[in-house]
């Protein structure tokens, strides 16, 4: 496997060839997932689906980005993320987990448009360092170095908390989330698409690996954090005037929902959580892409100015409507199916969650419909050409593709 990947470096400076090579690599992974190497192996279909999603996002980035250096950084990030999904031991997983921060950091510092990008980079580094070093401490104090990447040791509650902390920063859960809106607002559109679509999935994928530890301890603290994150972040969405910040807080609500699905340690919750991760990856990538396109054409990200899409470009308007309807979880989108599974499993485990979910969906519908109506009605500020978004249509099909369900059931 390693020699194949070294061969891929030959294509590295030709982004389109590299994309096709990675697609072929993905097909090999799908057909050969029992293929054990020394350091990497494909252990689960959910991780293969995440690899497919990362390649899909790379394809959209290739089509939408013209800056060669940003394309190279995107390729580096996708390779690191693919390696993160298939390691055989914990230290490799940790290494790629931390390595994934650097391409995003270079994108923000090198290609962000405002001076606040320095502040947001400080936030990113500080949160990453503070939450990740405890993971190394637990790693050296326990027997992880002789274990495979799935581990279910009987650890104390404090150790499990410290272990989860680094993944919680990448979810991100509410209270560890401050770096995300700042990074999104300062990052170029490509970095935002990769950050929302790929980087947040590393936290959930890592947390999936350590779910075995949680079966020995009380995980009430994560349930409370997930409930708080769902409600507080969706309230934050209501008060945002910047469309990119709104999309960032919307990511936090969805990832809190995924956390709630995973910490009720039951199979249906885990399945719903993984499908929700995939749905969120496709939806949020497109959300940031559309907001970025609007910003490039109009020079503003204000929700107030995002009016009259339907008057200026019909395809743009329809795509915008489909993406935000999918973000709300309307059927037959992948979001709706996964949310339905998660709701049914969480109500089985905890009856109280009905009230939290009620408030969450009420507020989530509100901010999505508010953005949708404010963009549909009103006086037109911007004229969109029809070609700006022609290549995003496949992503919408992927988002609404119920076929993914057959992999799980």
UniProtKB/Swiss-Prot annotation:
Q: Identify the main location.
A: mitochondrion
Q: What is its EC number?
A: 7.1.1.2
Q: Which reaction does it catalyse?
A: a ubiquinone + NADH + 5 H(+)(in) = a ubiquinol + NAD(+) + 4 H(+)(out)
GO BP: ATP synthesis coupled electron transport; electron transport coupled proton transport
Cellular component terms (Gene Ontology): mitochondrial membrane
One MF annotation (Gene Ontology) recorded for this entry: ubiquinone binding
Subcellular locations according to the entry: Mitochondrion membrane
- Topological category with respect to the lipid bilayer: Multi-pass membrane protein
Point out the signal peptide segment: none
Query: What's this protein's name?
Result: NADH-ubiquinone oxidoreductase chain 4
Q: Which organism is it from?
A: Ascaris suum
């Amino acid at each position: 496997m390693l020699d194949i990947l070294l061969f891929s470096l030959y294509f590295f400076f030709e982004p389109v060839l590299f994309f096709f090579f990675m697609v072929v690599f993905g097909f090999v992974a799908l057909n050969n997932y029992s293929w054990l190497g020394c350091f990497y192996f494909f252990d689960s279909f959910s991780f293969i689906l995440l690899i497919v999603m990362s390649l899909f996002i790379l394809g959209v980035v290739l089509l939408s980005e013209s800056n060669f250096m940003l394309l190279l950084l995107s390729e580096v990030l996708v390779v690191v993320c693919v390696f993160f999904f298939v390691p055989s031991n914990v230290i490799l997983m940790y290494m790629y987990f931390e390595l994934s921060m650097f391409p995003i950091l270079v994108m923000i510092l090198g290609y962000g448009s405002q001076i606040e990008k320095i502040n947001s980079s400080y936030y990113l580094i500080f949160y990453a360092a503070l939450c990740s070093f405890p993971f190394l401490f637990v790693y050296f104090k326990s027997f992880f170095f002789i274990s495979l990447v799935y581990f279910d040791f009987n650890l104390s509650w404090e150790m499990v908390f410290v272990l989860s902390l680094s993944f919680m920063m990448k979810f991100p859960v509410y209270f560890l989330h401050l770096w995300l809106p700042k990074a999104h607002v300062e990052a170029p559109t490509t970095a935002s698409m990769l950050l929302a679509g790929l980087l947040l999935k590393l936290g959930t994928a890592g947390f999936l690996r350590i779910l075995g530890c949680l079966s020995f301890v009380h995980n009430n603290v994560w349930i409370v954090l997930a409930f708080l994150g769902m409600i507080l972040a969706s309230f934050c969405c209501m008060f945002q005037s910047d469309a990119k910040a709104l999309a960032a807080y919307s990511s936090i609500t969805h990832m809190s929902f995924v956390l709630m699905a995973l910490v009720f340690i039951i199979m249906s919750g885990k399945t719903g959580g993984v499908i929700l991760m995939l749905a969120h990856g496709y939806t949020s990538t497109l959300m940031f892409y559309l907001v970025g396109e609007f910003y490039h054409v109009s020079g503003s990200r204000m929700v107030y100015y995002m009016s009259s899409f339907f008057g200026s470009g019909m395809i743009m308007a329809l795509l915008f409507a489909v993406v935000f309807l999918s973000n709300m979880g309307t059927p037959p989108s992948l979001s709706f199916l996964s949310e339905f599974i998660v709701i049914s499993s969480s109500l089985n485990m905890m009856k109280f969650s009905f009230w939290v979910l009620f408030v969450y969906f009420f507020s989530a519908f509100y901010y999505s419909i508010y953005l949708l109506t404010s963009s549909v009605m009103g006086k037109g500020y911007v004229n969109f050409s029809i070609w700006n978004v022609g290549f995003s249509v496949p992503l919408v099909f992927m988002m609404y593709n119920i076929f993914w369900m057959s992999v799980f059931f």
